[in-house]
């Protein structure tokens, strides 16, 4: 419905038929929403990222999904933290590729050569702004399991993480 008066203005009225959701429907929706937010509850991730801001953002987003996150600032620190950790401490490593001291490719290669098979086989997901097919291939050749592009898109990262748990 439209009402209009020259020099005064117009009024538009729209009627949208709908029904009120039952209490059961709204409760079910709340439970689904709540379980989605904690979809990675209890997962401990070793985040290897040299950029403080990127690390802070990734940590916050992962914590919102229910993860516990430890951070390594470069590949050397990542390898060292994994070697010193008890088996099963980390379920997955998120690895930046371009870092000082030791890059992500070299760190992944060192991890895959560890004597402890449980640590050597930990899932490693490359996180990098380089999203070309050759970058993905380089990550796989270094022993990483998968590749996600930055900036982080949780609609991509969460299912990728789930795939390896």
Cite the ranges covered by each PLM segment.
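C-terminal compact regulatory domains
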Residues: 1-165
